[in-house]
Amino acid sequence: MAPRVIGILRRFLPEYLKTRPSLTPAQWRAIRAITQCRTPALGGHRYACAPCQKETFAFHSCNHRACPQCGREATREWVERELAKRVHAPYFMVTFTLPAELRSAFFGPYAKAAYDIFFAAAAAALHDCLANPKWLGATTSGFTAILHTWNQQLLFHPHLHVIVPAAGINANDKVLCGKSNTFLVPVPALQAAFRRHFRSRLKALDWQVDPAVWRIDWGVNIQPFGSGAAAIKYLGAYVCRTAIGDGRIRALEGDSVTFAWKDRSHGNAPKILTLPGSEFIRRYLRHVLA
């Protein structure tokens, strides 16, 4: 049988808990769901065909977002809903990535507030820029933001993907549509607005940050995505699923786990990474937020 995440958890979790005994309630729920998924622990259904008398039994799925066996149906439904919402306008994928110096805010007592600030700052920055009459002039605009907390090596790398139509409504209730398929707003302007809104909201937290972080460029990327369908389908693979699927697991040998990853800095070159089993679990569980 091909190696799977469920097997990794079953093999290495006892050793992992010796050094990291305190997991969050959300992480415990995820572990329980994943290890019981499609097993007798969750029961099942027996399907019978009256004409041919054939019977088939299927165990229940856990449907937990962190389970690599689940999420396909929820993903399909999400993609269909988002495709149906599209407007007739050029679409863009905007990605917001926080500087590494700010990532410690996403641990411990500040975590929920930090994620709230991340979403709010990105949304406010987009609204500001889309409202500028030099670019679109829409005082009312809408978009879909999706949080990813991982990179291909399962390291903590929080970033937001936002699907943005170049469309909105101005102060006179007139519907506006961007005329360019390749330009939404200037990246430097969006970077500055994102940084400004994040900083103003962070002041509410009793958390110290190196002042130099406010003087560097923040990671903002804008890519044109035509009708938006490709962006929705791409992000749909992650909305109802987790950081790594069973298909990327290459080997489970001894004390190690080997999995495939793509090196984004070298043109998505395929690579292989081997980690101790306990380190794989640490990285995997880091992306279980709720």
PLM regions and their residue ranges:
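Beta->alpha loop/short-helix hinge microenvironment recognizer with preference
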Residues: 1-290
